[in-house]
Amino acid sequence: MKAVLQRVAEARVVVAGETVGRIGQGLLVLVCAERGDSEAQADKLLAKILKLRIFSDDAGKMNRSVQDLDGQGACGGLLVVSQFTLAADASGGNRPSFTGAAPPDVGRRLYDYFVAQARKLHPQVETGQFAADMQVHLVNDGPVTIPLHIAPDA
């Protein structure tokens, strides 16, 4: 499973002119299920995202996670957006291949599972809409952008 995290001051997702998800300070999480992925990869990816220390402490060092933005337990938001294009392979020419992405039914199941688990573990989770044409608006903070990959079990 792949994700790209962007530390944001704020972000929102718009579908057909309607805002469907919005957060203040936190993480925009673009997530993609790949062929061979299961709930195990989703769990590992989510655990990594929630504990990753990419927010600044009082000394300006990246020492805080989205679960503890201020050192006092204040949580930032998670805006989770499905993006199968993270599985793109552009090595063979000028048109990327997406054969590495999970089939749509599996992708939806794993995305829904990831979101459900995130909501169990984190107090503020917003989402886009799976397979929708979305406009993602964000104010990148830093900028800080982190790619993550949890490979399927061998």
Curated annotation (Swiss-Prot):
It catalyses: glycyl-tRNA(Ala) + H2O = tRNA(Ala) + glycine + H(+); a D-aminoacyl-tRNA + H2O = a tRNA + a D-alpha-amino acid + H(+). It comes from the Bacteria. Its main location: cytoplasm. Keywords: Cytoplasm, Hydrolase, RNA-binding, tRNA-binding. GO terms for biological process: D-amino acid catabolic process. It comes from Polaromonas naphthalenivorans (strain CJ2). Homodimer. Its EC number is 3.1.1.96. GO terms for cellular component: cytoplasm. A Gly-cisPro motif from one monomer fits into the active site of the other monomer to allow specific chiral rejection of L-amino acids. This is D-aminoacyl-tRNA deacylase. The gene is dtd. A motif (Gly-cisPro motif, important for rejection of L-amino acids) lies at residues 142-143. Pfam families: Tyr_Deacylase (PF02580). GO terms for molecular function: D-tyrosyl-tRNA(Tyr) deacylase activity; Gly-tRNA(Ala) deacylase activity; Ser(Gly)-tRNA(Ala) hydrolase activity; tRNA binding. Belongs to the DTD family. An aminoacyl-tRNA editing enzyme that deacylates mischarged D-aminoacyl-tRNAs. Also deacylates mischarged glycyl-tRNA(Ala), protecting cells against glycine mischarging by AlaRS. Acts via tRNA-based rather than protein-based catalysis; rejects L-amino acids rather than detecting D-amino acids in the active site. By recycling D-aminoacyl-tRNA to D-amino acids and free tRNA molecules, this enzyme counteracts the toxicity associated with the formation of D-aminoacyl-tRNA entities in vivo and helps enforce protein L-homochirality. It is found in: Cytoplasm.
